[in-house]
């Protein structure tokens, strides 16, 4: 009989032997000593304890956790990948002989020689953990069964489809405003990762989904119980009880219909490229899904003017996008595009869509200042029935990625902050130079800066106000989520005279809260507008006559 077959047979055999006959021998190493480094690595050890979590079977962790009955308790992982999942259960006391090692810094017993069943001792009571108060205890509780009695909020789902994990936070969602002290380090003590008892990539089925096949940010879970560990740079919990989620942030309805006012909206199309395999779709099937999603968003927004960002910088891409959007719309609701020959040298461009049945396009212009890698586009509009002029400028400032080693580095507001601030300054000067009869201009698009950062400070100092800010609670002022932190990068900004004409406004949270695997290039692409982009659209209704 081979080694692992002998182990399984031995385990099944000793279940029937009285505990005292097998487990009364001395010489066991305290789990606390193994964790503390008192026992030398790569040596043979005997440990005993109560089984607290069993993660055996296909695509699982390949082992189980033991915990002693001291206070405070210590826990340890036993790596036994060939052991059948039916051989152990929580509450069972066992004695394990094997080799003590550290795997990626985590202590564990592996290369098992013997496992003895010492009888049923009763399930270990979990240690209560509250965040952020107990954040300093998490290292000491690695390998221990814990319970989070307070409600935890889903604040990150980026890894859900990739590795089956969710980022959770105490005290509600993690919000990023750009103000000093609002960064990732400020939130570190509030976070824990809910894992799935496995480190396998692309789990199937994807765990923790609701009946709609999603798990939105803002949903909550209470009484989370499992084994605490630290892996891949984060404290993680492998649940021993199925988590029960509350859909605290259900999918929102489209903005309410408002036929009389003028509606202006932002729309990030997340790299709409006809050139396959570049930034956008990798195949014709993905492109078709992207088209369908974007058409659903446009129908839901029902805007008169749309400021687009992330369209491939070639004329055919914008033409195709407009054609695809118009296919499902009645004649009076179809769009025309406003672009400009001077669209910049970047791979992507901005553009404006508007409804000719409702608006007359009076003039267009582009800001060709070389400070802009994506030239802003301005359109002047007047209602078809007559009325005052309104300008809408589509913008997309430099992103916080591709950081340089020197110069405009990250000094607390992301790299390229100086460039974004200069772009804001140039934009204001350009708009002033084109102002027609004192008509106001709505700045619409992706500023790539949070509300309290320098570019927004400069725009506010020039009299620009966040048109959607009045109708939104602070917790709803976000359009993008990065590393579990929600913040606003996309804006509709204008002078107070325009703000006085706002009848309704909001952010349609259809994208940032949804897991990426629902996107057009994801593993499980969803139908409809959900995860049509990684940015949420902002909309505003104006009484403009």
Which residue stretches match the model-derived regions?
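Structural recognition of the beta-strand scaffold that forms the well-ordered cores
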Residues: 64-67, 96, 146-148, 193-194, ...
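Active-site His/acidic residue clusters
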Residues: 386-388, 394-417
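N-terminal signal peptide c-region/cleavage motif recognized by signal peptidases
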Residues: 15-20
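N-terminal, active-site-proximal structural segment of metallo-dependent hydrolase catalytic domains
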Residues: 21, 236-349, 405-428, 439-440, ...
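Solvent-exposed loop/turn segments at secondary-structure junctions
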Residues: 71-73, 84-85, 101-104, 199-201, ...
């Amino acid at each position: 009989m081979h080694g692992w077959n002998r182990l399984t047979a031995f385990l099944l055999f000793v279940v029937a032997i009285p505990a005292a006959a097998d487990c009364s021998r001395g010489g066991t190493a305290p789990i606390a000593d193994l964790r503390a480094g008192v026992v030398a690595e790569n040596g043979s050890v005997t440990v005993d304890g109560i089984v607290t979590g069993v993660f055996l079977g296909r695509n699982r962790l390949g082992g189980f956790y033991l915990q002693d009955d001291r206070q405070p308790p210590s826990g340890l992982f036993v790596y036994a990948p060939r052991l059948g999942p039916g051989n152990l259960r929580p509450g069972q006391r066992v004695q394990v002989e094997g080799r003590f090692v550290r795997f990626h810094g985590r202590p564990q017993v592996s290369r098992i020689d013997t496992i003895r069943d010492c009888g049923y001792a009763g399930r270990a009571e979990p240690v209560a953990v509250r965040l952020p108060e107990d954040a300093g205890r998490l290292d000491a509780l690695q390998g221990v069964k814990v319970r989070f009695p307070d409600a935890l909020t889903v604040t990150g789902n980026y890894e859900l489809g990739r590795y089956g994990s969710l980022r959770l936070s105490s005290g509600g969602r993690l919000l990023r405003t750009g103000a000093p002290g609002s960064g990732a380090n400020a939130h570190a003590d509030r976070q824990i990762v809910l894992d799935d008892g496995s480190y396998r990539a692309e789990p199937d089925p994807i765990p923790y989904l609701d009946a709609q096949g999603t798990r939105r940010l803002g949903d909550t879970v209470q009484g989370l119980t499992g084994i605490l560990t630290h892996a891949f740079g984060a404290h993680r919990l492998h649940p021993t009880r199925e988590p029960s989620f509350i859909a605290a942030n259900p999918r929102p309805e489209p903005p309410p219909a408002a036929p009389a006012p003028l509606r202006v909206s932002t729309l990030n199309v997340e790299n709409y490229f006809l050139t396959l395999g570049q930034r956008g779709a990798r195949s014709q099937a993905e492109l078709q899904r992207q088209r369908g999603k974007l058409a659903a968003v446009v129908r839901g927004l029902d805007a008169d003017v749309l400021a687009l960002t992330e369209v491939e910088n070639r004329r055919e891409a914008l033409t195709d996008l407009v054609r695809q959007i118009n296919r499902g719309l009645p004649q009076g609701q179809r769009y025309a595009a406003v672009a400009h020959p001077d669209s910049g040298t970047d791979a992507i461009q901005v553009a404006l869509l508007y409804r000719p049945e409702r608006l007359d396009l009076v003039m267009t212009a582009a800001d060709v200042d070389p400070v802009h890698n994506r030239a802003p586009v301005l359109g002047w509009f007047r209602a078809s029935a007559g009325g005052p002029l309104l300008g809408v400028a589509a913008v997309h400032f430099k992103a916080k990625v591709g950081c340089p080693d020197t110069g405009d580095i990250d000094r607390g507001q992301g790299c390229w902050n100086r460039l974004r601030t200069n772009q804001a300054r140039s934009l204001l000067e350009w708009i002033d130079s084109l102002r027609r009869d004192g008509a106001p201009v709505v700045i619409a698009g992706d500023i790539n800066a949070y509300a309290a950062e320098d570019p927004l400070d400069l725009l506010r100092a020039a009299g620009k106000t966040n048109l959607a800010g009045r109708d939104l609670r602070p917790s709803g002022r976000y359009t993008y989520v990065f590393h579990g932190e929600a913040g606003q990068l996309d804006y509709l900004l204008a002078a107070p005279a325009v703000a006085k004409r706002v009848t309704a406004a909001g952010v349609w949270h259809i994208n940032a809260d949804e897991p990426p695997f629902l996107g057009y290039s994801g593993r499980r692409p969803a139908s409809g507008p959900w995860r049509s982009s990684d940015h949420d659209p902002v909309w505003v209704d104006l009484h403009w006559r």
